Amino acid sequence: MRLCDTHIEEYLDAGKIVITPRPPKSAISGVSVDIRLGNEFRVFSEHTTPYIDLSGPKEEVSSALDKVMSEPIIIAKNESFFLHPGELALAVTYENVTLPDDIVGWLDGRSSLARLGLMVHVTAHRIDPGWSGKIVLEFYNSGKIPLALRPEMTIAALNFEVLSAPAARPYNKRVDAKYQVQQGAVASRINQDN
């Protein structure tokens, strides 16, 4: 069952879903909560790496990732991060989100931003039961003009579904939970896959 606005507010009041800072009522609509953009970004830096063998030896994958990803870029609240056409950037939500073992979250981009060519999450829009932390966004500008992104602008909507039962292996109890409690624009940790 997908939660409606009334139930989202009840779950927030009860502490079953935790979003910090707590969104105002105006950010909660029919079936979703507006989520804002944080101030940390990462991009692909200039490099000479010809490719990354995603199924290669973990040490080689790790080394390649270190070469291609920038250090975190922190943007002041009144400044903009410019995402140019054809560029991918990682960013992070302003809010921390914590879900219980029986709720899955779904992150959706905003239609108004998509109409300008901004993809807010390239593919990863599921927020697992047991998740806690800031959500990393995978931005891609598929449009034809640069887009100025500002910290704390509304960037996406998060909605929630109640599972048929609590998950037996929620994210916070998995040994391989490589992004649990992330607070920044964490780069890919594919080298930690089993």
From Swiss-Prot:
A Pfam family found in this protein is: DCD
User: Which GO molecular function annotations are given, in alphabetical order?
Assistant: dCTP deaminase activity; nucleotide binding
- The residues the record assigns to binding dCTP are 110-115, 128, 136-138, 171, 178, 182
The pathway to which it is assigned is: Pyrimidine metabolism; dUMP biosynthesis; dUMP from dCTP (dUTP route): step 1/2
Which reactions are catalysed by this chain?
A: dCTP + H2O + H(+) = dUTP + NH4(+)
> Does the UniProt entry include the keyword Hydrolase?
yes
Keyword set, alphabetical order: Hydrolase, Nucleotide metabolism, Nucleotide-binding
Write out the catalytic residues in the record: 138
**EC number(s) on file:** 3.5.4.13
| BP GO terms, sorted | dUMP biosynthetic process; dUTP biosynthetic process; nucleobase-containing small molecule interconversion
Note the CDD domains from the entry: trimeric_dUTPase
Describe its assembly. Answer: Homotrimer.
The family database entries (NCBIfam families) matched by this protein are listed as:
dCTP_deam
Its job: Catalyzes the deamination of dCTP to dUTP.
As for family, the record states:
Belongs to the dCTP deaminase family.
Write down what this protein is called: dCTP deaminase
Species name: Psychromonas ingrahamii (strain DSM 17664 / CCUG 51855 / 37)
Lineage of this protein's species? Bacteria, Pseudomonadati, Pseudomonadota, Gammaproteobacteria, Alteromonadales
